[in-house]
Swiss-Prot record:
Signal peptide: none annotated. This is Trigger factor. Keywords: Cell cycle, Cell division, Chaperone, Cytoplasm, Isomerase, Rotamase. Residues 154-173, 441-478 are annotated as: Disordered. It holds the Pfam family FKBP_C.
């Protein structure tokens, strides 16, 4: 096999590979000899089938394997001999307009096998000195007021409702049980019908204006509720449209007293109110710490990004940009928006998000090299913990989710990647100066610019919600 390097430009490499016909012939005969004792052909004793007859029966199928093995061998030889680190799998090209002829002649061992191997290699770079890097860690402790607000919400959400006396009108804060049928232009629409639906008036659970029109209703009343779906409604076919709902009120119940006491704590599995307060404070603090970590990580990645400048493999950038751009287009579609609505153009947005893709690739390569240099590993136990955490998100489908990940190495790798990244980030944090800075809740949860919010590599944390105390209540209750 002859391998000749023909191109070496930046991160691109090209090699010309030639496997002469006589070598193909030798490889074919070797493979046929190897299967001689394994095949059974009528009229021949086992192991006594002439190679010429084997070639007649199995020649083309065996030669196809020979050719595939030759291509794989060439790729491996190039990578090993040149000490290359590949960005993506090699591309194989045959001479234009001659591919079919070359392959057919090679299959018959009547012609040379000639092809080109195109590669993109990973860039080489030295890890930067980070001793001069200083980043802020935002610190916020839960206040008594925040804990009490969360307790009030928990008490409100867990309170009981008692039926109002016969003939009583529904008030804001009451819970009504209703049947409804929605229509647009006189036609019922999907998702517009419900039976025995409990609705707390004033909770803003339904479309704006819907609940207000049920205040004053009595059991047995039928009302025509007229509303307009918001322009940004998640169901595109309904967004911005006027609708009418025929509503029948079947029950009206008043909320019970909201008490924050030991009984409330026991309803949430705690011994007493003090234990519940501790759990709520811990849950809120955990959310604050998670948001602080997101901000700290972003500032660290910003600092890393400013420390490196090297060529990026075009294929990796293209791949990353395609993924980012698909998210952008899906987001616009979901919100029913255009680039013009966002005050930009498609071309300007593509340029902006291409920079984001480049940043992700660059930081991904840096973090990978840091991890390799520091010999950072993710254990199987850690991957299993992540897998079981993922499985718990799909109650009732545990086995299907488990089987999916165990039978899909790529999916399992996607669980391992963020674990590896967090370990690398922790390692890098140990190389920089971290200064704690007390901040307000507003400052902690202030959103970054959209372009900056997308960080590097696998770091794709979602923007947090400022209503974190609701999640904290769930955690404390869990």
């Amino acid at each position: 096999m002859q391998v000749t390097e023909t191109t070496s430009e930046g991160l691109k490499r090209e090699f010309q590979v030639l496997l002469p016909a006589n070598e193909l012939e030798d490889r074919l005969n070797t493979e046929l000899s190897n299967i001689k004792g394994k095949v059974q052909i009528k009229g021949f004793r086992p192991g006594k089938v002439p190679v010429a007859h084997l070639r007649k029966v199995y020649g083309k199928s065996v030669m196809a394997d020979v050719l595939q093995n030759a291509v794989n061998e060439a790729n491996q030889q190039i990578v090993t001999d040149k000490g290359l680190r590949l960005a993506l799998e090699p591309q194989i090209e045959f001479p234009k307009d001659e591919e079919q002829t070359i392959i057919e002649r090679a299959l018959d061992a009547k012609g040379d096998l000639a092809f080109k191997v195109k590669l993109e290699v990973l860039p080489s770079f030295e890890l930067a000195d980070l001793s001069d890097v200083s980043i802020k860690k935002l610190v916020l402790k839960p206040s008594d007021e925040e804990v009490n607000e969360t307790l009030e919400r928990m008490a409100k959400d867990s309170r009981s409702f008692e039926p109002r006396e016969e003939g009583a009108e529904a008030q804001s804060g009451d819970r009504v049980t209703i049947d409804f049928v929605g229509r647009i232009d006189g036609t019922e629409f999907e998702g517009g019908k419900g039976e025995d639906v409990d609705l707390e008036l004033g909770s803003n659970t339904f479309i704006p204006g819907f609940e207000d029109q049920l205040v004053g209703a009595k059991v047995g009343d039928s009302r025509l509720v007229k509303v307009a779906f918001p322009a940004d409604y998640q169901a595109e076919q309904l967004a911005g449209k006027d609708a009418e709902f025929d509503v029948t009120v079947k029950a009206v119940a008043a909320p019970g007293e909201t008490k924050i006491d030991d009984e409330l704590a026991k309803r949430f599995g705690m011994d007493d109110l003090e234990k519940l307060k501790e759990a709520v404070s811990k849950a809120v603090g955990s959310d604050y710490e998670a948001q602080s970590r997101r901000k700290l990580k972003k500032e660290l990645l910003d600092a890393l990004d400013g420390k490196y400048a090297f060529d990026l493999p075009p294929s990796l950038v293209h791949q990353e940009f395609a993924a980012v751009w698909a998210q952008v287009e899906q987001d616009l579609k979901t919100r029913g928006k255009t680039f013009e609505d966002e005050g930009t153009t498609e071309e300007a947005s593509q340029a902006e998000y291409r920079k984001i893709a480049e940043r992700r690739v660059r930081l991904g390569l840096v973090l990978a090299q840091v991890g390799e240099t520091a010999d950072i590993k993710v254990s199987d136990d850690e991957v299993n913990q992540a897998l079981f955490a993922r499985i718990r998100q799909f109650p009732g489908q545990e086995k299907q989710v488990y089987d999916f990940y165990r039978n899909n190495p790529q999916a399992l790798a996607e669980l391992r990647a963020p674990l590896f990244e967090e370990k690398v980030v922790d390692h890098v944090l140990g190389q920089v100066q971290v200064v704690e800075e007390p901040v307000s809740k507003e400052a902690l949860f202030a959103e970054d610019d959209e372009a900056d919010a997308v960080t590097g590599g696998a770091a794709t944390d979602e923007k947090p919600s400022e209503s974190n105390n609701e999640a904290a209540a769930d955690k404390a209750a869990g």
